[in-house]
């Protein structure tokens, strides 16, 4: 999810770039929360990446991301998420909360009341964003 969502911010960085970037492309942790980074439609952002690759004869696109997805994040691409149940105090709970809003508490309460297993080998859930 973080990788897919990071594509938007990489496209924003590349929208007016014609020459190869030598020091590497990275999306920093809090970069998505800067209002100046939400300037393109998602499709335009992906097209900026493709144009950059074409202009520089690149067949492979390499970048890094450090973004944290927390409440207040505006999702650009993802409407559904399959994930396991995360421990309290995990930053991954921030991602779930950002994705489903306050419903995360009801989801986790239900999981705990019904003895769902948590962590990597535990139960998983399919979450949908409320698009209204």
Spans of features found by a protein language model:
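Surface-exposed, charge/polar-rich loops and edge strands
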Residues: 1-132
């Amino acid at each position: 999810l973080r990788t897919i969502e990071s594509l938007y911010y990489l496209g924003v960085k590349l929208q007016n770039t014609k020459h190869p970037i030598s020091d590497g492309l990275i999306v920093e942790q809090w970069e998505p929360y800067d209002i100046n980074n939400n300037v393109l439609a998602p499709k335009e952002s992906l097209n900026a990446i493709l144009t950059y690759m074409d202009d520089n004869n690149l067949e492979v696109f390499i970048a890094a991301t450090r973004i944290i997805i927390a409440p207040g994040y505006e999702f650009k691409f993802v409407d559904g998420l399959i994930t396991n149940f995360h421990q309290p105090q995990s930053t991954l709970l921030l991602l779930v909360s950002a994705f489903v809003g306050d419903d995360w508490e009801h989801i986790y309460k239900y999981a705990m009341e019904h003895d769902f297993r948590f962590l990597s080998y535990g139960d998983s859930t399919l979450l949908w964003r409320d698009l209204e």
